Amino acid sequence: MSEEQTTQVNIKKKEKWGVAHIYSSYNNTIIHITDLTGAETISRWSGGMVVKADRDEPSPYAAMIAARRAAEEAMEKGITGVHIKVRAPGGSKSKSPGPGAQAAIRALSRAGLRIGRVEDVTPIPHDGTRPKGGRRGRRV
């Protein structure tokens, strides 16, 4: 009695990782996917490239569409996972990321990219230039 035995061969795909640099300010959101060294650009999209109105550039909706398009472009080029670096304007400007940062991370995940590390790389001043607003600050 000889039964045909089917063996299932697990073919592991080689994972190729990249870095998604997400710059999110209160004026725009830029998603820039590079290789691990950061030297080779794989895909770059911004909120202003996907919406018409200037006021919509920093919105979570624009960030979501830009991230999805960047992810599709990266996956076409063979990227399977990304480490994420989130950046706000920083320095003497705002140190908190804009409204599009979280939406962009979720869109990258939903598009099918594996998410590795999520890191905040906002520049912090070590007593750099004087912030704008004058001696007594911005009075609201």
From Swiss-Prot:
The protein, known as: Small ribosomal subunit protein uS11
Pfam families reported in the protein's UniProt record: Ribosomal_S11 (PF00411)
Keyword Lyase: no
Assembly and interaction partners: Part of the 30S ribosomal subunit.
Function: Located on the platform of the 30S subunit.
Domain of life: Archaea
Stretch list, region Disordered: 116-140
GO BP, one annotated term: translation
A single GO cellular-component term on record: cytosolic small ribosomal subunit
Keyword Ribonucleoprotein: yes
Family, as annotated: Belongs to the universal ribosomal protein uS11 family.
GO molecular function: rRNA binding; structural constituent of ribosome
Gene: rps11
Keywords: Ribonucleoprotein, Ribosomal protein, RNA-binding, rRNA-binding
